[in-house]
Every structure is written in C-alpha cells, then in structure tokens.
C-alpha cells in the first residue's frame, strides 16, 4: 500500500510539473514562454520596419509582439522592465497604422485581430510603442523611423 501511494504521489508531481504553466513547449534559450508563445526583448534600437524584419528572421511565425489580453500586457511589461536596460522612452510592439484607400486602421504585424487595446490617453496613430512612463504597460504612438528596443514573439513549432 505504501508503494502504491509513493508511485501515485510521484506521478502527481510529474503531472503538476508538466501542467499549470500554460507552456507545455520549449522556447529557445533566452526566450520566455507565456500562453503558447515565445517572447524575447532586444536592446538594440531599430526602426519599426527593421525591428519587424528582424523578428520575422528569428523564427517561423515571428513578429513584433502583439498583445491580446491584459495578462499578456502585464507579462510583456514585466519582461521589458527586467530586460531593457536602455534610456529609450519606447519599446516597439507590432501595432501600426496602415492607410488603406483614404482610411487609416491599426493592425498587428502578425495579422491577429485587435481584440484588446491599451492606448495611452489620446494615442492611436503611427507606430506603437510601450511607454516607459507607464512602466511599459500603455501604448503610445511615435515616429516609425525612431530607433527603439523591441520585443519579438512567435508560436513554437510542435
């Protein structure tokens, strides 16, 4: 009976260690996992276009980070606060205004729908960055040609 309990407890420990993180996959070394995606902040300032190009070269499906929930916003804000050690005020995210037939609309660079927004008061145009003044939680617009650190995101391959 004691052996049965010991084996059962061992299996429970293994199960709990493999579940509960929301990340039953491996991200490459130096990348952080959250809700089925891998994330990494980069300190080297780039323009928005150059940062997006860099992210697409990191992994299949890679782009500047799209933020789809308040939980993800908190995770990315914490990741940036802990890893971006530069004086820049903004950190690029994958949101950008696009002009289509006389109309402007914002879209994520990875093509996902905008279902969560967290613009700083009065902001919603040009390229978007996480603002240092809001602990990297709110989005501000800034010139797309400005050079800022950035965060890449990609879905890991099975």
From Swiss-Prot:
Q: Where does the UniProt entry say this protein principally localizes?
A: secreted
Q: Which organism is it from?
A: Trimeresurus stejnegeri (Chinese green tree viper)
- Signal peptide bounds: 1-23
Q: Cystine bridges: which residues?
A: 27-38, 55-152, 127-144
The function of this protein is:
Interferes with one step of hemostasis (modulation of platelet aggregation, or coagulation cascade, for example).
Tissue specificity is: Expressed by the venom gland.
Q: What family does the database annotate?
A: Belongs to the snaclec family.
What is this protein's record name?
Snaclec stejaggregin-A subunit alpha
InterPro entries found in the cross-reference section? C-type_lectin-like (IPR001304), C-type_lectin-like/link_sf (IPR016186), C-type_lectin/snaclec_domain (IPR050111), CTDL_fold (IPR016187)
Q: Where is the C-type lectin domain?
A: 34-153
């Amino acid at each position: 009976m004691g052996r049965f309990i010991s084996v059962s407890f061992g299996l429970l420990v293994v199960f709990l260690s493999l579940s509960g993180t929301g990340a039953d996959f491996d991200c490459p070394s130096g990348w952080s996992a959250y809700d089925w995606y891998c994330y990494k902040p980069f300190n080297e300032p780039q323009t928005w276009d150059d940062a997006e190009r860099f992210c697409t070269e990191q992994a299949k499906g890679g782009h500047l980070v799209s933020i789809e929930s308040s939980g993800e916003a908190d995770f990315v804000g914490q990741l940036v606060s802990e890893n971006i050690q530069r004086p820049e005020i903004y950190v690029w995210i994958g949101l950008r205004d696009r002009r289509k037939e006389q109309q402007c609309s914002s879209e994520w660079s990875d093509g996902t729908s905008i279902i969560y927004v967290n613009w700083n008061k009065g902001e919603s145009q040009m390229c978007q960055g996480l603002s240092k003044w809001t602990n990297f939680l709110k989005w501000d617009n800034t010139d797309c040609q400005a050079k800022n650190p950035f965060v890449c995101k990609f879905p890991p391959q099975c």
